[in-house]
Amino acid sequence: MRLLFEIDTKDYDLNGVAFIRHSARCINIKNGLVAMVHSVKYDYYKFPGGGIEENESEEHAMIRETQEEAGLVVIPESIIEYGYVHRIQKSDHDDADYFVQDNYYFLCDVEEAIYSQDLDDYEADEKFTLEYVEPDKAIFVNRNVHHGPKEQTMLEREARVLELLKEEGYFT
């Protein structure tokens, strides 16, 4: 899978403990709009997806997380690798540690029906909702609206992936 870009905040000590948590994310585009999870509480957009569990493939994690977070059922035969983003930064939990994450993005189609979500407690608290949104709106919101305690590098990652998709003609 191609490397889309890296985000390295260079604010960490490599002598600390690395916390590694890779994730997989769904890119579903319909009629010029992209499926995003909107945090109503903190007003930001993210691609549906999340952490890859032990012994789980990137594709299976993306399918599972997309259904849990967005209620969308991915059509497995439609999955195409898009690329990944490598992120490294100081840990949110311990200043002596650092966080490493590869975020794998997949283009895919989904079934027409939208099912109920199966949200984690923090996702329910943030009022995660599925929205098909114009990419420029999601980019603007992620970069220009105050998001409370949310980590800005994650929001910038999503904005940059949306910009790449636009540059490569996925929304025309």
Predicted regions and their residues:
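Short, solvent-exposed loop/turn segments at secondary-structure junctions
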Residues: A18, Y44-Y45, R87-K90
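A generic structural micro-feature
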Residues: A18-F19, A96-D102, Y122-K127
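Conserved Nudix-box catalytic region and its N-terminal flanking loop in Nudix hydrolases
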Residues: I29-E69, V73
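Nudix hydrolase/Nudix homology domain
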Residues: Y44, I114-T172
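Hydrophobic pocket-lining residues within nucleotide cofactor-binding pockets
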Residues: I52, V85, V110, P135-A138
